[in-house]
Structures are given as structure tokens and as C-alpha cells.
Swiss-Prot record:
Keywords: ATP-binding, Kinase, Nucleotide-binding, Transferase. Disruption phenotype: Strong reduction in seed phytic acid with a molar equivalent increase in inorganic phosphate. Strong increase in myo-inositol levels in seeds. Expressed in roots, leaf blade shoots, leaf sheath shoots and panicles. The gene is MIK. It catalyses: myo-inositol + ATP = 1D-myo-inositol 3-phosphate + ADP + H(+). This is Inositol 3-kinase. Kinase that phosphorylates myo-inositol to produce multiple myo-inositol monophosphates. Participates in phytic acid biosynthesis in developing seeds. Phytic acid is the primary storage form of phosphorus in cereal grains and other plant seeds. It is an enzyme of class 2 (transferase). ATP binds at residues 228, 278-281, 305.
Length: 397
């Protein structure tokens, strides 16, 4: 896709303009109140950059799409959150950004930088991935500017999601989010990703131990940390669960929640897998939406699993069927008589509720309808180059 005009995008601040001293911040405070009085006042903050994703199989390009966790996350939050919940997205792109008119960036415009847009090449193997093994090799080709603390809006938020993919969410930026938001949810990939030198044709994504990063000290102030089964060993679940609730996605086995004193397994949903990119991002957004609806953490993970599974049925950021979204909201309205956000930074209910099984059954029926429609409408497409659609699977980690 040819680059879109970026004249309407705000320009990024220079690095020497973005240092915010804690003492100065505490002196002047931030705009807005600290509480979440009612659902009509709930605003979320998503921090992470939009990207260019290039999908390859067998040495050839099979897809070029909008990427970046912020795109997938805002897509689900905009679609699934209860009425009255709003969203602000802080993302950075370069002048070469090719998707300014795509749905997510159009609703939540990024900040324009001199650096090129962050770009990833995802190389898929010819063999089908197992339930837990990585099904792609990811390489960062370009990296846009980091997101600095001063890039964040100067007001309070009910919740925040730190969803960096290329190291753009700096430790001081996450700390600023924690001060602005009543509760912060973090994707582990924003904390533990490292990149080999691009100068050598590398840029390969690898992981480092969370405890060895500057982010580790912030965990006690984080509400939820999401990791894939591949990332979990680097997170150190047993240590991290004593500081915050850790959610580990386990591919077609669903997910598990670990908190200090308990854990729970949450069942998956069927899916026609075409492209696993963004499954974990969509899971985290679905989970946050569940909390906004007033579900317990374990019940909210059902909504996370549902949207993670729905996301893999299309290449790139998915377009959800309006009838499916309507059905999901009707299910939630029936389960929760009046939405009352549980993202309040103080109290979370982790255990499954008495309606958990019924909620899973209802969402599973909606998921099966999506699968049947996908198989009927798209029995053979170019998307099959990315991943087989011949059998039902469940969301990847």
C-alpha cells in the first residue's frame, strides 16, 4: 500500500524536550480526578507503536499489513467495551507510514516522527506449529522513536495498557503510566524483547529475563502481566505472581491465571487459524474489556480467549462481524445486569464466578458461528499461504 498523507498527524517532541522530573510532576500534579466514579467516565490509555508487518513463507512475501499491538488492542477495545468507555492511544510512526487511513490509526492517529515506521518481518515455517512452539521467526527491520513520558496525555485514566513490541515503551514511560492510570495491564513483550544488530542483517527478536531489566521493580505496581507460553520462562511466573497477577496464554489449551495464593485455567474457543499475528494482543484487549464489563479476572479471561481466537481468522488487524459483536454484547449484558468496571486499581476478584461455565458456553456458540461463516465464505484464499485453514484450532500463545 502506498504511504498515506501524514499531514494531520502531530509531530513528535524532541528527546531533550521529553524528560519529566518526578519532583516537578508531583508539585504540579496531573489534570483530572483520581477516581472512577461511573462507567461514563472510564477512559483507557493504550501505549505502543503501530508497525508495518511483512509476512513471508518459503522465501516469498505472502502479506503486508498494519501491525503493532496498539492496532490490535484498540481494535478490540473499540469494538467490545461497554457503552461509555473511551480510549486514548499513544503511538509513533514515520513519514513512510502506509496505513494512516486504516480503521485503528484513523480513529486513534499516531504521532509523526523523523525515524521510519517500526517494521517487522515474520517468517512462517512450512510445518504447522504445535500448541506451544513458536510458529514464526520474527525480525525487526526498522525501529521508530521510543515513546517518552512527556508523550503521554496529562490527565488521569481508569486503566492503561502498555503494549510495546519493539522496545518503544521505556521504563520511565511505564512508570508514568502507572502514575496516570488507576490500573495498568502490561504485555510481557513490551518488557523482555531484545533485538540482534540490524547492521548484520539480524534484528532477530529474542527474550531476556524480566528480573534483569529495569522494568522488574515496577511489577508490584502493575495489576496484570500477560505472557505467552514461550515468554513465561523469561518472566519467571513463580516470582512475578507474588507481585501481580500473571496471565499465560497456552495456545489451543486456553490460558492460565496465576496470582499470590491461587491460579485458574480458562478454556479456549474454536478458531479457523489463518494468521496468528495479534492473537495475544487481542486476548489482552478482550480481557481488559471483560474487566470493564464487571467480570472477575478469570471470567474476563474467557472474553480474552474469545477475541484471541477471533483475531487469528484473518490476516492482519481483523474486522469483526457486527452480528458477532452484537451477540457478544447481548451475552455480556445478560451476564452482567449493569456494567460496573472492575478496573479500579484497588480491588480485583480473581476467582471464577458461578456464571463462568454458562458464559463460556454462550461465547462458544458465538465462536462456532464465526468459524462456520469463515469456512463457508472463504474456503480457499491467499490467506492460506500464511496458515492452513483446513482444520479448527485455537488461539496461539
Amino acid at each position: 500500500m502506498a504511504p498515506s498523507p501524514a499531514a494531520a498527524m502531530p509531530l513528535a517532541a524532541e528527546p531533550d524536550e521529553v524528560v519529566v522530573e518526578v519532583e516537578e510532576e508531583e508539585e504540579r500534579g496531573v489534570k483530572g480526578g483520581g477516581g472512577v466514579a461511573g462507567l461514563d467516565e472510564v477512559e483507557g490509555l493504550v501505549v505502543g507503536s503501530y508497525c508495518h508487518d511483512v509476512l513471508l513463507r518459503g522465501g516469498r512475501v505472502v502479506g503486508e499489513t498494519l501491525g503493532g499491538a496498539a492496532a490490535f488492542v484498540s481494535n478490540v477495545l473499540d469494538a467490545a467495551s461497554p457503552a461509555g468507555a473511551s480510549l486514548a492511544v499513544v503511538s509513533k510512526v514515520g513519514h513512510d507510514f502506509a496505513y494512516a487511513t486504516a480503521a485503528a490509526p484513523a480513529r486513534h492517529p499516531p504521532v509523526l516522527c523523523a525515524s521510519p515506521t517500526t517494521s517487522f518481518h515474520a517468517r512462517f515455517s512450512d510445518d504447522a506449529a504445535s500448541a506451544h512452539a513458536p510458529d514464526r521467526q520474527l525480525r525487526r527491520v526498522h525501529a521508530c522513536d521510543p515513546i517518552y513520558p512527556a508523550d503521554l496525555p496529562d490527565r488521569r485514566f481508569a486503566y492503561g495498557l502498555a503494549v510495546g513490541v519493539a522496545g518503544e515503551v521505556l521504563p520511565e514511560t511505564l512508570e508514568r503510566m502507572i502514575r496516570l492510570c488507576r490500573a495498568v495491564l502490561v504485555d510481557a513483550q513490551a518488557l523482555i524483547r531484545a533485538f540482534d544488530g540490524e547492521a548484520k542483517g539480524g534484528g532477530a527478536v529474542r527474550h531476556v529475563a524480566l528480573e534483569a531489566t529495569p522494568y522488574a521493580r515496577l511489577l508490584p505496581r502493575v495489576a496484570f502481566l500477560k505472557a505467552s507460553s514461550e515468554e513465561a520462562p523469561y518472566v519467571g511466573v513463580e516470582t512475578a505472581r507474588r507481585r501481580c497477577c500473571v496471565i499465560v496464554t497456552e495456545g489451543r489449551d486456553g490460558c492460565r491465571l496465576y496470582w499470590d495464593g491461587g491460579e485458574a485455567r480458562v478454556a479456549p474457543f474454536p478458531a479457523v487459524q489463518v494468521d496468528p499475528t495479534g492473537a495475544g494482543d487481542s486476548f489482552l484487549a478482550g480481557f481488559a474489556s471483560g474487566l470493564l464489563w464487571g467480570l472477575s479476572a478469570t471470567d474476563a479471561a474467557l472474553l480474552g480467549n474469545f477475541f484471541g481466537a477471533a483475531a487469528v481468522s484473518q490476516v492482519g488487524v481483523p474486522t469483526f462481524d457486527p452480528k458477532m459483536l452484537q451477540a457478544v454484547k447481548q451475552i455480556l449484558e445478560k451476564a452482567v445486569k449493569r456494567p460496573c468496571t472492575h478496573i479500579n486499581g484497588n480491588t480485583f476478584t480473581f476467582q471464577r464466578s458461578s456464571m463462568h461455565d454458562e458464559l463460556h458456553k454462550s461465547l462458544q456458540e458465538a465462536a462456532m458461528l464465526v468459524c462456520e461463516q469463515k469456512q463457508a465464505n472463504s474456503p480457499a484464499t491467499d490467506n492460506g499461504d500464511v496458515c492452513s485453514i483446513n482444520e479448527l484450532t485455537s488461539l496461539p500463545s
